[in-house]
């Protein structure tokens, strides 16, 4: 299995859960758990990877005319976060199976959860800045769906709208910062960005680039002073919040 398929697996899992949800609640949980566990087990043999080494970089044609490829990397740091995403995700799958009531749609919950896990996994495995941004925007969308899961509750609808508005606006700032960063470096590949520290810091656009990226990251991760949407997001089901 390549990194491309590893990143794609949770999205396939989201579709699979939706298909088997008609067979019963347990089938949805088993499908979500099996896909998550399979991806986690695939990453397990690389657990010895040092933090300063890159094990694998894979590229697939995406928009070659624009110089953009689907590019994935696996190093010690991305492996750590991928393990956290999948490990905690597996616990959420188990917890939610016994937490949600008979009236709750198990298939919809697990499909949205798999979409969220896939989006986060795509972020930590991305080698391309634009691709990373696409996955990060998918976390905003899937967060909206999860926070508004109990859509009959006003606080859930309000929390979902607030989260989407704040993180969506932050996405525009992040896009601007990434475009400037790509302009400075001449590439959107993270490997090139990491190797161009001196060039970036000495460039006249360094400060606006840094400010835009920080604005995007702070809004999406609910850092002060953009943390106000996070308490409202707790309207999501407890296994998520």
Predicted regions located by residue number:
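...captures the hydrophobic TM-helix bundle architecture rather than a specific catalytic motif
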Residues: 1-241
